[in-house]
Amino acid sequence: SQTKMPFALDWKFEGPSAPYFYAIDNGYFKSEGLEVEISAGKGSLDAIPKVATGAFPVGFADINSLVKFLDKNPSAPVIAVMMVYDKPPFAIAGRKSLGITSPKDLEGKTLGAPPPDGAWAQFTPFAKANNLNVEKIKVEPVGFPTREPMLAEKKVDAITGFSFSMFLNLVRLGVP
């Protein structure tokens, strides 16, 4: 009999989750006695507690978010067992037409950032490494579903997110 194995993703079904679906479709998990069911998530800060509470035995999440979670919850029964990205896909996307061509250009502009976003969580060290005056950057808390549309509609000058997700969403919205 197959062992049920719920798997919590950090995000929607996008490119990075393809290997897991490939393994399901080609019977790799089944041949190991596993019945894997993949659930979409709402960010790493959604996936990690699902595993820590036992709601899911395994999940996919950003290592930086896990470190932050474990700092606040040192006795949580959750560990990292594998690295997927060789470097994080954190990015800030801005529009040339709005004057964003370098990190310093964020000063005097509005940055749209979802509060639970992994890229936003790394903004402070990014700003420090790039000598940014964060007091000159207006940060607009935005939702994940509205992030790219707000940039497309020029309601914000730049956004935080994962490079591959933002790129595809912005192309879909017709942003050059």
Question: At which residue positions do the language-model features occur?
Answer:
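Short, glycine-/small- and polar/acidic-enriched structural segments
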Residues: S1-E153, D157-F164
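Extended amphipathic alpha-helical interaction segments
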Residues: V156, V171-L173
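Short, intrinsically disordered, charge-balanced linker/junction segments flanking boundaries
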Residues: S165-M166, L173-P176
